[in-house]
């Protein structure tokens, strides 16, 4: 007989405001424990130094976390000019010090170089793997391995301020963009070196900044629930966003309840008006209940790709 997973069935997304100094996995496990969720996963790690938006998917929402991994991100970053470190951030050792002598015109010209579609060579201090091992493990042993450049897009790069030797930028970029690498490359282009001293992720996809919560806020709600002798879920669950927000940019296909049984068994159903290979959000009936994602095939049929398991316990919806 299959063993029931520990924790309760709860499906939704927490917009965690990660604090500095902790790993993304540590933050994930804390959220999972606060919600007593049977399953949890994050949607793109932040360095321990970094703070800000870390969407945590609970329960069936984990099936759609890849779509948030692929989403655009936005960051506020402050760089210290005149010093280059081995990790390109303040957690590393200073390896070179140079005077800061560039002009404002040179700075603005250098920033223009990073806008749009470019190629980026990932830092050795990254979680990308080479022969099964994360690059940072090689770096810590003083070993440099070959890395191929990867295409990235910087949609916006806004100059915020330059105060003394500290430069602050706002960067809206595609998935897989390493902000530390942008800062290191910028420092070399300016001839003075630079490294990240503050990094805050302010946006993932279209999630609102104002919806973020900290671990301290979650812990306070759990404490409050215990003091009031109520289940913590009463105070915590209203913070969850519906899991279909992870695929909010997909067009919706509403399927009649009569077709639900076919879909939930993995069978394709006929839908008109959409091109082949279009990924869609599937909802059922007049309530537009989200049940997963699918794709249109060449025959005009909607084939389910990722469907949720519907439990007796509540699913977070609008």
UniProtKB/Swiss-Prot annotation:
Key words of the record: Isomerase, tRNA processing
Q: Which reaction does it catalyse?
A: uridine(55) in tRNA = pseudouridine(55) in tRNA
Has UniProt tagged this entry with the keyword tRNA processing? Answer: yes
**Coiled-coil annotated residue ranges, if any:** none
InterPro entries per record: PsdUridine_synth_cat_dom_sf, PsdUridine_synth_N, PUA-like_sf, PUA_sf, tRNA_psdUridine_synth_TruB, tRNA_sdUridine_synth_fam1_C, TruB_C
Q: MF terms per GO, please?
A: RNA binding; tRNA pseudouridine(55) synthase activity
| UniProt EC number | 5.4.99.25
Which residues act catalytically here? 47 (nucleophile)
Q: Can you cite a GO biological process for this protein?
A: mRNA pseudouridine synthesis
Fetch the Pfam families from UniProt. Answer: TruB-C_2 (PF09157), TruB_C_2 (PF16198), TruB_N (PF01509)
What role is this protein assigned?
Responsible for synthesis of pseudouridine from uracil-55 in the psi GC loop of transfer RNAs.
- Family membership: Belongs to the pseudouridine synthase TruB family. Type 1 subfamily.
HAMAP family listed in its UniProt record: TruB_bact
Q: Under which name does UniProt file this protein?
A: tRNA pseudouridine synthase B
Organism whose genome encodes this protein: Shewanella sp. (strain W3-18-1)
Give the lineage.
Bacteria, Pseudomonadati, Pseudomonadota, Gammaproteobacteria, Alteromonadales
């Amino acid at each position: 007989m299959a063993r029931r997973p520990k924790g309760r069935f709860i499906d939704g997304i927490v917009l965690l405001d990660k604090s500095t100094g902790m790993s993304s996995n540590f933050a994930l496990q804390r959220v999972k424990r606060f919600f007593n969720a049977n399953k949890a996963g994050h949607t793109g790690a932040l360095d321990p130094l970094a703070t800000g938006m870390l969407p945590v998917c609970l329960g069936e929402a984990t099936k759609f976390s890849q779509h948030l991994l692929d989403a655009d991100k936005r960051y506020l970053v402050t760089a210290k000019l005149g010093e280059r470190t081995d990790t390109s951030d303040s957690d590393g050792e200073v390896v070179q010090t140079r005077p800061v002598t560039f002009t404002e015109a040179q700075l603005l010209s250098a920033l223009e170089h990073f806008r749009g579609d470019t190629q980026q060579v990932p830092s050795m201090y990254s979680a990308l793997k080479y022969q099964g091992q994360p690059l940072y493990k090689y770096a810590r042993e003083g070993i440099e391995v070959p890395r191929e450049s990867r295409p990235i897009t910087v949609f916006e790069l806004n100059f915020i301020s330059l105060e003394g030797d500290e430069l602050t930028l706002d960067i809206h970029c595609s998935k897989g963009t390493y902000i530390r690498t942008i800062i290191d490359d910028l420092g070399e282009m300016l001839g003075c070196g630079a490294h990240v001293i503050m990094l805050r992720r302010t946006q993932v996809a279209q999630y609102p900044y104002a919806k973020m919560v900290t671990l301290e806020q979650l812990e306070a709600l759990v404490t409050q629930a215990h003091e009031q002798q109520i289940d913590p879920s009463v105070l915590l669950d209203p913070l969850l966003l519906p899991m279909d927000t992870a695929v909010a940019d997909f067009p919706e296909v509403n399927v009649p309840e009569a077709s639900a049984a076919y879909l939930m068994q993995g069978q394709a159903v006929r839908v008109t008006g959409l091109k082949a290979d279009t990924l869609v959000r599937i909802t059922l009936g007049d309530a537009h209940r989200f049940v997963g994602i699918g794709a249109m095939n060449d025959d005009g049929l909607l084939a389910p790709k990722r469907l949720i398991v519907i439990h007796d316990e509540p699913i977070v919806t609008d």
